[in-house]
């Protein structure tokens, strides 16, 4: 720990980058920076060798589920043999929740149509309450009727956690069956947000539904407002333009004489 130099960290970052994983290289450096910061606090060394390492430029990936892809995915979900995984993905589509939140959902967390997420399952480690739509509640009712024996978790398993922890395999199978490429499970959350925008929801409302503690996180969806904003400004423009034009003369119809 005490012998690690800037050159060592820089060489590691370059090596991982050259292997074709520039983002992983950045994550590694970030982890090392945290480790050495703790080492300084614990008086194990005086400097952080990560300081000054130039990170690789990252491009924020934006991928959303198209209308056609949604239809194909829905059909694939109906035929998928793993009903629990399929239902978990349906809930992801209907709630915009994170994968970990859905998989750790407890029956006791849902009451009167509201899902109260426990701090242990949320990214912010805080309570988050969100109302569930009628289709989401119907799906949960169907899952509960099918669940035998009853379990505390909506998606139980025999593992250490007591609930499903991974659905990557099912997701890969579903994407292949639906002919969908380049779509991650987390992209369903982005797709949910884009649908909220299309429905006229404001950024603060979207942030509240998604459980964002930082408004800047929600601002990534601001570009989706371009279409409704364009429509709104066109309406105003039409009114202003019409006000500046002279009124069209009203043609008086000649009254025909009686025969």
Residue ranges and their predicted role:
Residues 1-13, 58, 62, 185-186:
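A Lys/Arg-rich helix-loop hairpin that forms a DNA/phosphate-binding surface
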Residues 4, 85, 181-200:
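Short basic/aromatic active-site micro-motif
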Residues 19-31, 41-104, 122-127, 147-150, ...:
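Basic, Lys/Arg- and aromatic-enriched nucleic-acid-binding interface segment
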Residues 23, 41, 90, 94-101, ...:
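C-terminal catalytic core of tyrosine-transesterase DNA break-rejoin enzymes
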Residues 47, 108-116, 181-182, 201-220, ...:
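Short, polar N-cap/turn motifs at the start of nucleic acid-interacting alpha helices
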Residues 68-71, 121, 131-181, 259:
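Active-site/catalytic core of tyrosine-dependent DNA strand-transfer enzymes
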Residues 75, 136-138, 142-151, 156-161, ...:
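C-terminal secondary-structure termini that scaffold catalytic or DNA-interacting sites
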């Amino acid at each position: 720990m005490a012998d690690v130099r800037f050159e060592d960290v820089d060489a590691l970052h370059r090596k991982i980058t050259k292997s074709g994983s520039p983002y992983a290289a950045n994550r590694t450096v970030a982890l090392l920076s945290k480790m050495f910061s703790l080492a300084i606090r614990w008086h194990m060394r005086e400097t952080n060798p990560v300081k000054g390492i130039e990170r690789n430029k990252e491009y924020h990936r934006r991928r959303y589920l198209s209308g056609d892809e949604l239809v194909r995915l829905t059909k694939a979900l109906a035929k998928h043999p793993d009903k629990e995984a399929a239902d978990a993905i349906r809930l992801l589509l209907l709630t915009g929740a994170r994968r970990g939140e859905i998989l750790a959902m407890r029956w006791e967390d849902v009451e009167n149509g509201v899902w109260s997420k426990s701090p242990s399952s949320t990214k912010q480690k805080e309570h988050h309450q969100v109302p569930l739509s009628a289709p989401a509640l119907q799906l949960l009712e169907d899952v509960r009727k099918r669940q035998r024996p009853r379990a505390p978790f909506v998606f139980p398993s025999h593992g250490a956690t007591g609930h499903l922890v991974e659905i990557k395999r099912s997701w890969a199978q579903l994407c292949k069956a639906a002919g969908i490429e380049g779509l991650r499970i987390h992209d369903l959350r982005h797709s949910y947000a884009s649908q909220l925008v299309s429905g006229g929801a404001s950024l603060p409302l979207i942030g509240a539904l998604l459980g964002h503690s930082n408004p800047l996180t929600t601002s990534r969806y601001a570009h989706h407002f371009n279409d409704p904003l364009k429509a709104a400004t066109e309406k105003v423009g039409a009114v202003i333009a019409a006000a500046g034009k002279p009124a069209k003369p009203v043609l008086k119809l000649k009254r025909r004489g009686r025969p």
